[in-house]
Regions:
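A short His-aromatic
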Residues: 8-10
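Conserved class I S-adenosyl-L-methionine
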Residues: 29-55
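A conserved beta-strand element that flanks and buttresses the S-adenosyl-L-methionine
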Residues: 2
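A short glycine-rich, Lys/Arg-flanked "PGG" loop and its adjoining helix->strand segment in the class I
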Residues: 14-29
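A conserved pocket-lining segment of Rossmann-fold NAD(P)-dependent short-chain dehydrogenase/reductase
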Residues: 56-63
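Conserved Class I S-adenosyl-L-methionine
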Residues: 63-160
Length: 160
């Protein structure tokens, strides 16, 4: 079983691990990577602040954070009692410099803002989005014109 950069969208990794174990034949292998603790710190900081802003907080009253991004230690704890014969979990720093502001804005627009934009009514979407972009660029833009964001990965290899 293989997955690349998708499983942070799956919130119940306990169930994921149990189903993976069930699906694998004896000696079968699961290999995946997904976002881990510390991923996109700038963006998530901006968003946590923005959804608490008095102008927008009513739209996020029932909002559930859409990602599961554990630390290596947290994931090791999750896998401990699943029954796998081998478990290897590593963390990777995959920090990224976007070539320019436009490249970062494209990343903000798709996929990063999608779960938030679904909560905001049409009449304030543009204002909300523009404020997020402006704050992100104020924090991420480097003197050379690139834009920096933290990216942290969890790499998992499981053998049944």
């Amino acid at each position: 079983i293989f997955s690349n950069a998708a499983l942070h969208w799956v919130k119940d990794h306990n169930k994921l691990l149990k189903n993976t174990y069930t699906a694998l034949k004896q000696g079968g292998i699961a290999v995946w990577n997904f976002a881990g603790d510390g991923n996109c710190e700038t963006f998530y900081g901006v968003m946590r602040k923005k959804i608490k802003d008095d102008r927008y907080k009513e739209y996020f009253a029932d909002f559930e954070w859409p990602w599961f991004m554990p630390s290596k230690a947290e994931y090791e704890t999750l896998t401990e009692k699943m029954g796998f014969s081998e478990v290897a979990i590593t963390e990777k720093n995959a920090d990224r410099y976007f070539a320019n502001a436009d490249e970062m804005i494209r990343w903000i627009d798709q996929p990063s803002l999608v779960p938030f934009m679904q909560c905001v009514p049409d009449e304030v979407k543009k204002e909300f989005r523009d404020e997020v972009v402006e704050e992100m660029l104020s924090k991420a833009l480097q003197p050379d014109g690139t834009c920096f964001e933290t990216f942290r990965r969890i790499n998992v290899r499981l053998v049944k």
